[in-house]
Amino acid sequence: MEEKNTLVIGDFHFGTKTNSIQWLEEMENYFVEIESLIVANCAQKVIFLGDLFDVRYSINTLVGIKVKDMVREMIERNPVKSFNFLAGNHDYYSPKKEDMHYNAYEMVFGSEFMKEHDNVHFYTERPYLDEDGDLYLPWFFTEDKELFGQTIEHFKGELIKRIFCHSDLCTWDIDMIKNMNGNPVYSGHIHTPWTDEEHKLYNLGAALPLNFNDVNDKRYVYLLRGTEIVRKFENEETYQFYRYFNEEIFDLTKFDNCFVQLYIDKDLINKAKYIEKVKELKLNNPGISIRVVAMDKTMINDDEVGIDMNQDIKKYIDSNIPKNLYSKYETIKEKIEEREK
């Protein structure tokens, strides 16, 4: 049996930046671009990996209607293709399991939408294994380790080929990985792409950069054929985020559709050549947000106490991780150290 082409899309966060109209228009344009990728690559199945919406406790009326209309138009223009939407943490009103019914898909689309369109599926309150062997796990079913174990046990003996979820795969411990029985896992949730090839774990990242945590980094839509990622399509449509340091700014001229931070040492920032270069960049890029940040030689923590940069930074980091996050930090650190060996 020939493997289906599957287009996989990470977090979108419609309604971000306090429901900014400007951002909404950018995201609408990219949504249209994604439909062209679906058609051009003969994708029979389309999977959104969660966090289609941003503000979990309220959906802006304009945002909700725009997204509903875009999804409706997309699935109606492609009636023989299967469209699948996983619920992410931002799509739920509350992090309590008993409240999982209160989610963005139920409010914006409702069960009537699925009855009207038989080629769209929203996975919000229970896992689902489809006829292709794709297992869909909404956010709640990976965040609770006990619930995760029960879910995998429930599908034991079934033919699972791929798993799609909304989780930080970097924090999965060896027990969770063993439960996968070697099946690849593709996930949203973490905005920066991350891969563990050995265990077949793929955090595919967000569909678009959303803030300066995504600085100097590209985002993609992925084409899968079977379990293999056969192509990545770079997002060149929406805003990008860039950060440059000191002498790097002298290689810059024009920016396009982005936000820029220029980090300059305090002892350099008032030198004539830096002042003139910053003026030139702002003059030549009137529509671009360019922020200049003066850097100190020391790092500053929340209490505005200077850190001795000659001390062991690893020990400093270890001692400043919050207790409730330390186990996750240890898991991530061990994986990084293992990969660096």
Model feature map: region roles:
Residues 1-65, 148-160, 335, 341:
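N-terminal active-site segment of His-dependent metallophosphoesterases
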Residues 225-341:
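Accessory, non-catalytic peripheral segments of nucleic-acid enzymes
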Residues 84-178:
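Conserved catalytic scaffold of divalent metal-dependent phosphoesterases
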Residues 119-121, 132-134, 160-161, 177-185, ...:
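Active-site regions of enzymes building and remodeling cell-envelope glycoconjugates
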Residues 168-232:
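Conserved beta-sheet core of the metallophosphoesterase superfamily
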Residues 8-10, 45-51, 82-89, 121-126, ...:
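Active-site neighborhood of phospho(di)ester-bond hydrolases with catalytic His/Asp-centered motifs
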Residues 18-20, 50-71, 87, 92-114, ...:
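Metal-dependent catalytic neighborhoods of phosphoester/phosphodiester hydrolases
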Residues 74-79, 155-157, 176-181, 253-255:
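Short, conserved loop/helix-junction motifs that constitute active-site signature segments
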